[in-house]
Amino acid sequence: MSSSTDDAGTTTHSLQEFKLFETQSNFYMIGWDGSGVYRVLKIDRLDPSELNISQDSTHYTKKECYELLKRIHEGNKATGGLKLVTLCYGIIGFVKFLGPYYMLLITERRHIGDLFGHSVYAVSKSEIVALHNSTVQCNFANSRDENRYKRLLCMVDLTKDFFFSYSYNVMRSYQKNVCNYETGHNLYEKMFVWNEFLTRGIRHHLRNTLWTVALVYGFFKQASLSESGKDFKITLIARRSRHNAGTRYLKRGVNRNGDVANDVETEQIVSEDVPEDHPMQISSVVQNRGSIPLFWSQETSRLNLKPDIVLSKKEPNYEATRLHFDNLVERYGNPIIILNLIKTKERRPRESILREEFVNAIDFINKDLPEENRLRFLHWDLHKHFRSKTKNVLALLCKVATCALMLTDLFYYQVTPAMTIEDSMSLSSSSDADTGDISPHTSSDDDNGDHDSLEKKSSRSKNIAYGKCDVKPPRLQSGVLRTNCIDCLDRTNVAQYAYGWAALGQQLHVLGIRDVPAIELDDPLAISLMGLYERMGDTLAHQYGGSAAHNKVFSERRGQWRAATQSQEFLRTLQRYYNNAYMDADKQDAINIFLGTFQPEQGMPAIWELRSNSLSNGRNGEMNIGKDERFLVKRCLSDGDFLHESCTPLSAMSSNHESMPQKGFSAPLQHVSHILSESSSDIPVSNDVALSRCTPSMPRKQLFGDVQKVHRFGSDQVYFGGEEDMSSVSNFVDIEWLSSENPCENALFDRSSELTRNLTAETSSTENSVNGVGQSAPTISESGSSSSKGKEPMGTKIREDFPDSFKEWVAYGEALCH
């Protein structure tokens, strides 16, 4: 995004500041890039139902631009002349409902960080400007439906969790930016650019992206830390997919294209903290979360906090599920590692229904894949393990994370002083640059095919750059860990923190900041990282579930008073329930309007008229929706801070907003004390969660050694362990070792150190590396001291006629709703 090719074939730096002027017949936007070059964009106002945009190919100086504006003013004096409308920082896009077009602008921005010398911004204020003027008649400009559509658009609060950069491709991971650099319009077609639809018209007209910004929705946070006197910066980025996006109970599972709800890519970048933010060594690692890729749903209920889960469609060949995993391979390469955290056994089957079908789907898909490309999985009932008072779940999750890291590796890149970071971003072929040729029917969405070229481009780059600048070859991440629970919020966030914790030690080790790739759980670095992941979890939960995440584990680690934690969890359960039951329908409509999933047409039903129709005719991608077809609202998952309930973020809109339903919910609250909310955390708090004083490691026996084959759900599943414990099933990690009580062996990290020492050597087969560890690495046990003892009952005698859940709450002080 640092440059774009205009219609004259000239490469121009990104425009970053703009002024919008108006006459009675046209808008004129003046943009400049900070280097003294000014450009002019003209937008016609006489036919507001059509988007007529033209760009002046002339590159003006400041003086020439001033003279041009003066001439325009003189020529329009009879109709009021040229007037300044606003200063702005980029065009978000254009949208049309039933009447005229509207232009969305960023009028205020705030700096939130830097990536390798490139500034990253968030939106502080936005404005919507109607293209028509008061003298032009527009039949639908002030109609009731038109105003309601504008109010829906205004519900999208662009000041919450949207971010962008003029010169760095924040919608792509650092590895993709280095190994397959892209510019221009292709970037807007990625799955993480939320204003792709809104910018489609102007990009098609101008065949460049000089005037627009690509908005990413999710989370961005940086922290500067120090270890042994060495400063480094950690950046945590979450990118939410625009595909199958929506609110929690209205978007669940997978659609027919293989897109899952709540699909979020999380990237953890660690780099040297140096002046001017030009680090010489950088490491990044990517993980993924997403809804279970099956056709399933849950009805929103105002009387039931725990609605039933329904498998709405069973595919004999699991085509949509297969498409989803094919897409993950195209995005990240092999192997795909699935960490499935949902429940195994329930009094009334809910999550377990999906677990069984998910196991079937993975097994069916694996039968058609070569052994080296099969899906790796760990079905691990996190709720059950958290309820066990003898297990340190974070340490166990770190074991899983370390095994996954050994299979996928991480990305490491070194730049010498002879090579700038901009040079490193251009290692791939120049043919990837934007040519300016845009076809409305072509798409490079989702970075499909990018990973196939990583090795080839990296190899070519060695010959081009490494020989001249003495740059060490990079380490490449190939594959990804995909984590899910039911909502992919609370349990998933704990698991993602464990993965980030394991990765951070290895990233600091490969950067030479730490001598060993192991970080204890009570290390200040782990605590700082926990704060970042907790904040990310809250943000993503607000976007998807309507409340902050259930963070009982993190609260316990901070030493928060248990009663305060219980109250906090209870209030978050109520907040999530209320938003899901009463607010999500309008929020879903707002998302669909913003993303272009629904496009209003005159004479056709409005989006709010289709809600009941959608409930009776289709759910979760079962309805056939072509690219040019109108949309029928679907039920599924996601919510967000991104939706502004007061409907004011687009400040130019002054219409009176319709009030949201304000029905009381006293009746449902009567059931809260005995109905467990599926939205609440399924993670009981236990002090032993905080007791990891040592780092996980490799088992004594070979990781892929002799395993027991168990016939399960009609197919052969790899099962580790002596008993048929259905809470834990895996084909890539030894469950018996995972649950063992001696998690302090060092072989895993010994192997990691060996990989670091051999950084410049060619990367060997990932699976062979793992097998080699199991065969050769001895295990050494350490005694890990604990900062506190395991949790004990309070000693209160409880009557036997009370329910088990109540007795457990009295004995262990846990929340009734969990």
From Swiss-Prot:
The yes or no answer to whether the keyword Membrane is present is yes
Q: Does the keyword Membrane apply?
A: yes
Entry GO MF terms? phosphatidylinositol-3,5-bisphosphate 5-phosphatase activity
Covalent S-S links between cysteines: none
Assembly: Component of the PI(3,5)P2 regulatory complex at least composed of ATG18, SAC/FIG4, FAB1 and VAC14.
Role description: The PI(3,5)P2 regulatory complex regulates both the synthesis and turnover of phosphatidylinositol 3,5-bisphosphate (PtdIns(3,5)P2).
Query: What protein am I looking at?
Result: Phosphoinositide phosphatase SAC3
State the gene name recorded for this protein: SAC3
